[in-house]
Amino acid sequence: ADAFITGLYTKYSNTIKVAKDIIGIRPEYKHFGTMHILNTKKGVFYIADTLINRHPDAEVLADIAKLAANSVSFFNDKAAIAMLSYSNFGSDKEGSPLKVHTAVEKLQKEYPDMAIDGELQVNFALNKELRDEKFPFTRLKGLDVNTLIFPDLSSANSGYKLLQALSP
């Protein structure tokens, strides 16, 4: 299955367990995640992982980004992926920024044509002029980022709900 839609009244954790047991995970992945799609005045944004992986490590983040890129292409769009953090390109070399940086390095090595970079703050991710001026080396240069990969479940879920609330 390429997608799985559940209702408002189903406990999410039960639904995910059933989906994993019955549908399974694609052979080329070890993990799976969720992605919300928001259609805003500034365009369509794909946000992951908003519901499943509480504290993903670099390997899980890499799978989430690959899954997101594949899902975005399913909608006839091309993913320009920002791997988000409170840090920009190694300005903090510990904790959450390090795992994001490690995931980006892995993906850039394995998929040299993938439009992905990070770790970076959301204001740089969504403002191409600011990002390109401050970080001219980025693989996202000149691109409008449309896919946001958050470092953990709390920030991803809060981020998509914030965008949803601000974009009637």
Residue ranges of predicted features:
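Anion-binding alpha/beta catalytic cores of soluble intermediary-metabolism enzymes, centered on
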Residues: 1-168
